[in-house]
Swiss-Prot record:
Assembly, per entry: Interacts with DAXX to form the chromatin remodeling complex ATRX:DAXX. Probably binds EZH2. Binds annexin V in a calcium and phosphatidylcholine/phosphatidylserine-dependent manner. Interacts directly with CBX5 via the PxVxL motif. Interacts with RAD50, MRE11 and NBN; indicative for an association with the MRN complex. Interacts with histone MACROH2A1. Interacts with histone H3 peptides methylated at 'Lys-10' with preferences H3K9me3 > H3K9me2 > H3K9me1. Interacts with histone H3 peptides unmethylated at 'Lys-5' (H3K4me0). Interacts with MECP2, SMC1 and SMC3.
Annotated region described as Interaction with DAXX, given as residue ranges: 290-427
One GO term (biological process): multicellular organism growth
A single GO cellular-component term on record: chromosome, subtelomeric region
Subcellular compartments: Nucleus; Chromosome, Telomere; Nucleus, PML body
Keywords: ATP-binding, Chromatin regulator, Chromosome, Citrullination, DNA damage, DNA repair, DNA-binding, Helicase, Hydrolase, Isopeptide bond, Nucleotide-binding, Nucleus, Phosphoprotein, Telomere, Transcription, Transcription regulation, Ubl conjugation
Top-level enzyme category: hydrolase
Record PTM Phosphoserine, positions in chain: 62, 74, 112-114, 162, 345-346, 354, 423, 425, 427, 449, 453
Protein name: Transcriptional regulator ATRX
Functional note: Involved in transcriptional regulation and chromatin remodeling. Facilitates DNA replication in multiple cellular environments and is required for efficient replication of a subset of genomic loci. Binds to DNA tandem repeat sequences in both telomeres and euchromatin and in vitro binds DNA quadruplex structures. May help stabilizing G-rich regions into regular chromatin structures by remodeling G4 DNA and incorporating H3.3-containing nucleosomes.
């Protein structure tokens, strides 16, 4: 009698501990002995209904975590109950061997249930739960038969859907991916529920009313079967839709690839055409630029050539004018030394003295009468040359030059400015050349026995000429300087030609040329 009372107290305490754990912990094996198999059925059906309700809101991660937590809680609760039972047995100290054996068996059962495998107890428990096991087996057989029927129907529906695949429109890849994810999530949830149902079924508290439990079990079975059928239909539809979408996507991708390839070819052609156009445009621009540059160069060459021609014309005009200036004094300078030389060779000193006197008179006066007098003198010279045919052969080219000089002077009788320049150049050349054609004794200031007074007369007009020449040089411009330089050069050439005729006086003439060059340089420095 004591053992029965103690056992009842332990059962009450264990029920209180199960209530505190919010119904998530597993009951002890003793409670299973007390209650009927109908209570177990009710608890299983309630667990299934609650699990189906909360199915849609759960996720994979939450399910996994909940399972681990529940297993840990169940293991902890079982260990706590074991400890409490051991303490109570230790305090009371009076228990029968039968109770000890039952405790050992029940501990083994708890361990097997924590691992997810349910094992029926031996002895009396087998007789108590045999009826519930048979009923569970019958329920499972009925559900299996219904599942087979639904499978046959689903196969027929799949065939019909495969026929209607071609008619349906194309769905995007995004829809396919979303549907595939949903189907996978649902399949995983179902599998997890199937594993979790047997573990949770044992953790619920039993209810006393047997009639209510039977009704709820029947309604839940019907609901579960209907839901299963709907789920199977949804799976088949989604799988068929995914197959269609994949086929259509492949066909669409092939068509889009063909279109894309055609578009790419068109784009490449356009790019090539544009590149060709650009190249042609650049070539045309280069050609135009080359043409423009060539035309500009030609124009520049033409302008430069025209300017060069103008400069050449100006230079040629200036050279012609300078040539004219050169020619006139040269020819006139050649005349006077030839007269003097011829007069000295013939021995007519009076005629040689009269020629420079007339030239000085011409320098003083610029009237046409002086010009006429010059012409008369030239004619007289020609007559003297024709009369004196016994002269040396060296004098013959000089006579031709004299004729040319006479013609030029007759052709240009009215040029006043040229006569002025000629008169200046004549005076300069006379200064440089008269001492050359003196007698040797006169250069050394030695006079002839008959003509000392004549030498004095010559020196006076020479001094008078030098003063006049200096005054004219101060007034004259740079052009006269050039003419003086040219005249000095001409006089040097004439002196060289005369040196060939007169080898006796070469040393004296060289000394005079050096003196003349020195005097010319000094004059330039003064200016």
């Amino acid at each position: 009698g004591r053992s029965v009372v103690e056992f009842g107290d332990m059962v009450c305490k264990r029920q209180q501990s199960a209530v505190s754990s919010a119904g998530s912990e597993k009951p002890s094996g003793k409670e299973e002995n007390v209650h009927s198999p109908e209570d177990k059925r009710v608890t299983k059906s309630k667990e299934k209904s609650k699990h189906l309700r909360t199915r849609t809101g759960r996720k994979v991660k939450s399910d996994v975590t909940d399972r681990f937590r529940k297993k840990e809680q169940s293991s902890e609760s079982s260990e706590g109950e074991k400890k409490q039972g051991r303490q109570r047995t230790g305090t009371r100290g009076k228990k029968s061997t039968d109770l000890k054996e039952e405790k050992v068996k029940r501990e083994r059962e708890y361990e097997s249930s924590s691992d997810g495998t349910e094992k029926l107890p031996e002895g009396e428990e087998i007789g108590l739960f045999s009826k519930g096991v048979k009923q569970n087996k019958n329920d499972t057989t009925d559900e299996a038969k219904k599942g087979k029927k639904w499978k046959d129907k689903s196969c027929e529906k799949k065939e019909e859907l495969s026929d209607s695949v071609d008619r349906l429109p194309v769905k995007g890849e995004s829809c396919d991916s979303s549907e595939d994810k949903k189907t996978r999530n649902r399949v995983s949830l179902r599998e997890k529920k199937q594993f979790s149902l047997p573990a949770k079924s044992s953790g619920k508290r039993p209810e006393c009313s047997s009639s209510d439990t039977e009704r709820s079990v029947k309604g839940e079975c019907c609901d579960s079967t209907d839901k299963r059928v709907k789920r199977i239909d949804l799976r088949e539809r989604r799988s068929s839709n995914s197959k269609r979408s994949t086929k259509e996507v492949k066909s669409g991708s092939s068509s889009s690839d063909a279109e894309g390839s055609s578009e790419d070819a068109k784009k490449q052609k356009k790019q090539r055409m544009s590149a060709k156009k650009k190249n042609s445009n650049t070539k045309e621009r280069k050609r135009k630029s080359l043409r423009a540059t060539t035309t500009k160069r030609k124009q520049a060459d033409i302008t430069s050539s025209s300017s060069d021609i103008g400069d050449d014309d100006q230079n040629s005009a200036g050279e012609e004018s300078s040539d004219e200036q050169k020619i006139k004094p040269v020819t006139e300078n050649l005349v006077l030394p030839s007269h003097t030389g011829f007069c000295q060779s013939s021995g007519d000193e009076a005629f040689s003295k009269s020629v420079p006197a007339t030239v000085d008179d011409d320098d003083d006066d610029n009237d046409p009468e002086n010009r006429i007098a010059k012409k008369m003198l030239l004619e007289e010279i020609k007559a003297n040359l024709s009369s004196d045919e016994d002269g040396s052969s060296d004098d013959e080219p000089k006579e031709g030059e004299k004729k040319r000089i006479g013609k030029q002077s007759e052709e240009t009788p009215g040029d006043d400015g040229s006569n002025q320049v000629n008169s200046e150049s004549d005076s300069d050349s006379e200064e440089s050349k008269k001492p050359r054609y003196r007698h040797r004794l006169l250069r050394h200031k030695l006079s002839l026995s008959d003509g000392e007074s004549g030498g004095e007369k010559k020196t006076k007009p020479k001094e008078h000429k030098e003063t006049k020449g200096r005054n004219r040089r101060k007034v004259s411009s740079e052009d006269s300087e050039d003419t003086d330089f040219q005249e000095s050069g001409v006089s040097e050439e004439v002196s060289e030609s005369e040196d060939e005729q007169r080898p006796r006086t070469r040393s004296a003439k060289k000394a005079e040329l050096e003196e003349n060059q020195r005097s010319y340089k000094q004059k330039k420095k003064r200016r």
